[in-house]
Amino acid sequence: MSSTDIWISNDASTFQKAQLPTQLRHVKVIKIREDSIGRIILLISTEITNEENADPDLSEIFISDSQGLKFSPVEWTPNHQFGNFRLTFPDFLKGTIFGSFHPSIDYSNHQVNYTENIAGGETKISVDNGLTWSNLKVVDEENADSFGCDITRPERCSLQGYFYNLKLSNPSAGIILMTGSVGDDNEFDRKDRKTFISRDGGLTWRVAHNSSGLYATGDLGNIIVYIPSPSYKDGDVQSKLYFSLDQGRTWNQYELVDALFYIHPLELINTTPDGSGSKFILSGHLITTASQEGNNTNISYIARSVLYAIDFSAAF
């Protein structure tokens, strides 16, 4: 297979061939981004190939010089041969990038086992526009014993976000929430997902809730609203909303529905795009259960859609 070239134009008219650190074969450019100082970031992901004697490259991140013509690899190379990168650039934290790598699964192998466990990836943070990267350090003495590794060794025990949903909370003054698990980069159990909070722009993290769910911030991070996702497998239905008025240090709860229903949340947003407001919208479905005649099991069904307006204007 011939190599792939990258062409750059600074005037939308003439193009120059980019200088790459290696030839690109069996790869695809997932996304092209610009950092906060104008450099180009390329996400290069390796494709699985059946060609004999193929020598595929590792998935990499390339970052350009100030002219956008000469690219160098980022010093972050996961120990996987195939995989995909995803980068998240918080608009409210200039220079900060969250990166998540997830190894590819070869579906041609019919021996693949589908379990609650998922192949481990790597999640890292850069605060200098991608020049250097570090693991997401967990600083949470209260919950340290609940993790399967030693959080005092962040190089081997750190917060790992989920590649398909590296979702950060709304804009705030360094207050970020993220769903993930704590471990190394080997394997993660979906049932271990928790919601974590950082108050320093993503450098250190601690547990906010022992479940995954929807979250949004308001008043630039002083207000946090959280509603857990229901766990139907364990019979853990959801009817409560949690909120914090002190950046997630303490939490209160509010009963959304009566005992006849529980809620399946779909979306939770702050009505102010810049995250400064104190009003939120929660949408979802009200779920109820009923037993069928001649059937000992209960059947769940949607009673109706529901929309909540949540206002903390009078909270301060």
From Swiss-Prot:
Keyword list, A-Z: Repeat
Keyword Metal-binding: no
CDD domains with a match to the protein in the record: Sialidase_non-viral
InterPro entries reported for this sequence: Sortilin_N, VPS10-sortilin
Record's GO cellular component terms: membrane
Positions annotated as BNR repeat: 62-73, 124-135, 196-207, 242-253
Name of the protein: Uncharacterized protein YCR100C
The keyword Repeat belongs to this UniProt entry's keyword annotation: yes
